[in-house]
Amino acid sequence: MSSAGLNVGKKNAYTAVKVDPDGDYCTPGAFELERLFWKGCPKYTHVNEVWPNLYIGDEKTALDRYSLEKAGFTHILNAAHGQRNVDTGPEYYQDMTVEYHGVEADDLPTFKLSQFFYSASEFIDNALQDERNKVLVHCAMGRSRSATLVLAYLMIYKNMTVVDAIEQVSRHRCILPNRGFLKQLRELDIELALQRRNTKNSLPSNDDENSTTI
């Protein structure tokens, strides 16, 4: 797909896009992504492990320093950082051995959360390099902002499609990113698929390898 084709796919968020003509996968349209959440999900609880040592939680979980320390959390990503949201910050956890990362985001379809996809994912991935670490990603309810950042992490660092990532997290927690965030995850899915296609096309084919050895 050309860059022009990629832009068309981004503009029409309700149409499936196939980046790799040789593959079977198509990035779903926005409505199809929403349908993935209609399959049902686990009963809502304050915090859930959705990937080894990676948890999604809500404001109540983030404010309970005693339980966080007892559970062994070492890293906290607040996807609702700020005075009008979940107002914690590194000073709130200063008596704990916790590394804090704040993202000032509003749970609005018009908010560009994608600007934080890579920095938040890098924070999570760096933390999980040590298997002793435990990461909590939270917002107010633990369903939209925090879930979106975790989905982006799984897509960027674990090579998952947006469908794979949603299915992985939904098995463990009831999440529901707003429609604007889903569109941004869809754009990320197209971007990553294009990168994978370009990487695959840049590798020498078996025919090329055979011709050089003859």
Swiss-Prot record:
Which reactions fall under this protein's catalytic activity?
Answer: O-phospho-L-tyrosyl-[protein] + H2O = L-tyrosyl-[protein] + phosphate; O-phospho-L-seryl-[protein] + H2O = L-seryl-[protein] + phosphate; O-phospho-L-threonyl-[protein] + H2O = L-threonyl-[protein] + phosphate
Localization per Swiss-Prot or TrEMBL: Cytoplasm; Nucleus
Arranged from A to Z, the UniProt key words for this protein are:
Cytoplasm, Hydrolase, Nucleus, Protein phosphatase
- One BP annotation, GO: protein dephosphorylation
Q: Which GO terms describe its cellular component?
A: cytoplasm; nucleus
Q: Name one GO molecular function term.
A: protein serine/threonine phosphatase activity
* Domain of life, per lineage: Eukaryota
What's the EC number here?
A: 3.1.3.16, 3.1.3.48
Q: What range does the record give for the signal peptide?
A: none
Assign the protein's first listed, main location to one coarse class: cytoplasm
Query: Matching Pfam families, A to Z?
Result: DSPc
Cross-referenced InterPro entries: Atypical_DUSP_subfamA, Dual-sp_phosphatase_cat-dom, Prot-tyrosine_phosphatase-like, Tyr_Pase_AS, Tyr_Pase_dom, TYR_PHOSPHATASE_DUAL_dom
Instruction: Provide the active-site residues from the annotation.
Output: C139
Q: Which stretches make up the Tyrosine-protein phosphatase domain?
A: 46-194
What residues does substrate bind to?
H138, C139, A140, M141, G142, R143, S144, R145
**Role, per record:** Dual specificity phosphatase able to dephosphorylate phosphotyrosine, phosphoserine and phosphothreonine residues within the same substrate, with a preference for phosphotyrosine as a substrate. Involved in the modulation of AMPK and MAPK1/2 signaling pathways.
Regarding protein family, the annotation reads: Belongs to the protein-tyrosine phosphatase family. Non-receptor class dual specificity subfamily.
Q: Which PANTHER family match?
A: AGAP008228-PA, DUAL SPECIFICITY PHOSPHATASE 29
For this entry, the protein name equals Dual specificity phosphatase 29
Q: Which organism is it from?
A: Gallus gallus (Chicken)
Q: What is the lineage of its organism?
A: Eukaryota, Metazoa, Chordata, Craniata, Vertebrata
The record's gene field reads DUSP29
